[in-house]
Amino acid sequence: MLKSVIENVHALEIFDSRGNPTVEVFVTLSNGVVGKAEVPSGASTGENEAVELRDGGSRLGGKGVMNAVNNVNTEINDALKGLDPHDQPNIDATMIALDGTPNKGRLGANAILGVSMATAAAAAKDNHQPLYRYLGGTDLEMPQTFHNVINGGEHADNGIDIQEFMITPVAKTSFRDGFEKIVNVYHTLKKVLEDMGYETGLGDEGGFAPNMKNSEEALKALHESIIKAGYKPGEDIAIACDCAASYFYNKEDGKYHLEGKVLTDEELADYYDKLLDEFPELISMEDPYDENDVEGMVKFTQSHKDRIQIVLDDFICTNPKLLNKAIHEGAGNASLIKLNQIGTVTETLETIRLSRKNGYNTMISHRSGETGDTFIADFAVAVNGGQLKTGAPARSERVEKYNRLLEIEEELGKGERLAFFPDNVDLD
């Protein structure tokens, strides 16, 4: 039987959950098998992320992606024809070399990632395997999910500076059991917010976007909702935050402008300590300091690494070189993993391996501009990612991922392994 090879790579411009253009890619093999991928995009982006190629000009507010689409349909298609779709490292290395820039800025990370993901999808189909099995083999684990149920910062038009307030099921008997707990708290939260006099419109990631005064009020609403839903804060459901501190850091004075206050590194740490003392169920903080504030991040890690999970997002941008630097500096104890920050499946896997080797947890993540593509659900299971965040249990582009995880759990059958976090954090 002849080995299948890539016959054609084709892209077109589609739209994401924010109504912005993005790239969809189809990889067709010589035996007729087709793999498809849709590329997400972020609103809160790190300085060191791989570059999305946007068209500029007046069409679609300058956000069109026809140049990226054309790059797929011409240069990338020509370069990949005849290659083995099962050799993912070679596919990705070929595109990186073809691009020739350190940030994928010539062809576009949105073009390259779409092809990388679609190739993996095609190869899995060619093997008659689900994507999670093709990428991950047999020793698989269902991830613990983190759900952004109150949106602030760049993800909502309200007065909260911290970007995401998440809930996570720390006690569960199955993925479905944990997800049902989250759904119960989510619906309870809506009623709690209404009783507090807030509107319950949704932000980009399906969470509510109430115009609250400060982050403490958001945490109080979550705490109350967990209890009213019939659960114990910290024992059944815990809380996590994405601070996205780069968005309230002022480069001119080197201080953090947060909720009407101007704070130094030390004062910001005191502010976080106040929240942690008041809400011991708060177990994880993402990007608590600006992506260039190495001193602040390292000091906070030294003083808090045994108390909470400190997740690096903008600080490392899923880049193994930046992660290696953070490891040597002693920053953080967990890595946020976003495929489109680095731009290929292979490089994403490299960052995950480096994280594991150095004792860092990993949290696979969606972006605020999403599509119905469920690649990251399979990916999180395949790499035993441990943790996954992909929004609230609302808006179809978010729920599609959770529904895919429910399908995967059913396919794995009884006895599937569950990721649990925290296992090193004292919640008493």
Curated annotation (Swiss-Prot):
Pathway: Carbohydrate degradation; glycolysis; pyruvate from D-glyceraldehyde 3-phosphate: step 4/5. Catalyzes the reversible conversion of 2-phosphoglycerate (2-PG) into phosphoenolpyruvate (PEP). It is essential for the degradation of carbohydrates via glycolysis. It comes from Lactobacillus johnsonii (strain CNCM I-12250 / La1 / NCC 533). The keyword Secreted applies. InterPro entries: Enolase (IPR000941), Enolase-like_C_sf (IPR036849), Enolase-like_N (IPR029017), Enolase_C (IPR020810), Enolase_CS (IPR020809), Enolase_N (IPR020811). This is Enolase 3. The active site is at residues 205, 338. Coiled coil: none annotated. The lineage of its organism: Bacteria, Bacillati, Bacillota, Bacilli, Lactobacillales. Its cofactor is Mg(2+).
